[in-house]
């Protein structure tokens, strides 16, 4: 873990590093060695030096002019062909992807997203978060995936995004019924292959078809099943994204 972090910080050369309070000791040593002098903490309980510093900031927001081709994020790949590579994503990449998916997936006023994905991955960090953000939607934020908690929260939501294993675990919950998903309109899966058995059981159990999509760290979303169609398992024919 420390070796990976040393590589990421050294490669990205960030001006600021934010970590959990319990990891401050070893993370700050790596950051200082790499030349990053600003290391702040942010805890799950909404405490930490980042918020302490923010409390003393001016209420005036100063906009920084940005072009579409300006770098917005460096997202590190899983490293399947060697060491993780930093995928350089621009502001134009992020904005166009969010705009296209908002239209294509039918985001609308009143939508509520259940977010139970890790935010170190493009699915949770950009696709889910930016979808809710650009639509101005409420988000039910879960720090980790808990199938029982997700089932309890389903009646409050309209959109859920997950990887196939999350759907398998939800299907193991007796509380997953058509009544529980009565307000849901969209279930999305990606990041790994969705088995046809899971696809069919989900549709039979809930009355909803899981919408499959495909993307990667370097491009965000590339293709997606149509939203307003009775799609087949494994069909991802239409190119989408930015």
Write out the residue ranges for each language-model feature:
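Structural core segment of the AMP-binding/adenylate-forming
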Residues: 1-53, 65
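Short beta-strand->loop structural element characteristic of the AMP-binding/adenylate-forming
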Residues: 1-18, 85-88, 115-116, 137-144, ...
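Conserved S/T- and glycine-rich ATP-binding loop of Class I adenylate-forming
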Residues: 17, 71, 77-80, 113, ...
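Short secondary-structure boundary segments
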Residues: 20-22, 43, 144, 164-165, ...
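Hydrophobic/aromatic ligand-binding patch that stacks against planar heteroaromatic rings
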Residues: 30, 131-132, 202, 221
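Conserved pre-ATP/AMP-binding loop-to-beta segment of ANL
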Residues: 57-76, 82-83, 106-112
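Conserved AMP-binding/adenylation subdomain of ANL enzymes
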Residues: 95-112, 120-159, 173, 227
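Gly/Ser/Thr-rich phosphate-binding loop
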Residues: 154-162, 171-239
